[in-house]
From Swiss-Prot:
GO MF, any single term: structural constituent of ribosome
Gene3D superfamilies per UniProt: Nucleic acid-binding proteins
UniProt-listed NCBIfam families: rpsL_bact
Annotated organism of origin: Zea mays (Maize)
Subcellular location: Mitochondrion
Function, as annotated: Protein S12 is involved in the translation initiation step.
Keyword Nuclease: no
Gene that encodes it: RPS12
Keywords of the record: Mitochondrion, Ribonucleoprotein, Ribosomal protein
InterPro entries according to UniProt: NA-bd_OB-fold, Ribosomal_uS12, Ribosomal_uS12_bac
Protein name: Small ribosomal subunit protein uS12m
Native organism taxonomy: Eukaryota, Viridiplantae, Streptophyta, Embryophyta, Tracheophyta
Chain spans, region Disordered: 1-27
CDD domains in the cross-refs: Ribosomal_S12
Family membership noted in the UniProt record: Belongs to the universal ribosomal protein uS12 family.
Length: 125
């Protein structure tokens, strides 16, 4: 417990907030190149094969990014746009690939939540 004199001399130091997406350098999105595309199993109560990509961003950071939706066309050397946003049951995956931009195609025939998956508007009859 500091004395009043110590507080007058030094004051209180503000706690710094930690940046969860430091690799993005305060940018909303960053472009990167896929180094490897693979699957990973989630944490305990869940069971699946989640698709992830190891991406080297334009600022030379290597990250793991989740590929959302069913099916994808990503390969090694594909160029993707990455946004922040973690995957709760995959430790160490703190980014999402954006569908429908650069080399990662949107999901065809998707009707709901189209904007999140880069899907075209369905033709009305």
């Amino acid at each position: 417990m500091p004395t009043k004199n110590q507080l007058i001399r030094h004051g209180r130091e503000e706690k710094r907030r930690t940046d969860r997406t430091r690799a993005l350098d305060q940018c909303p999105q960053k472009q990167g190149v896929c180094l490897r595309v693979s699957t990973r199993t989630p944490k305990k109560p869940n069971s699946a094969l989640r698709k992830i990509a190891k991406v080297r961003l334009s600022n030379r950071h290597d990250i793991f990014a989740y590929i959302p939706g069913e099916g994808h066309n990503l390969q090694e050397h594909s160029i993707v746009l990455v946004r922040g946003g973690r995957v709760k049951d995959l430790p160490g995956v703190k980014f999402h690939c954006i569908r429908g931009v650069k080399d990662l195609l949107g999901i065809p025939d998707r009707r709901k939540g189209r904007s999140k998956y880069g899907a075209e508007r369905p033709k009305s009859k």
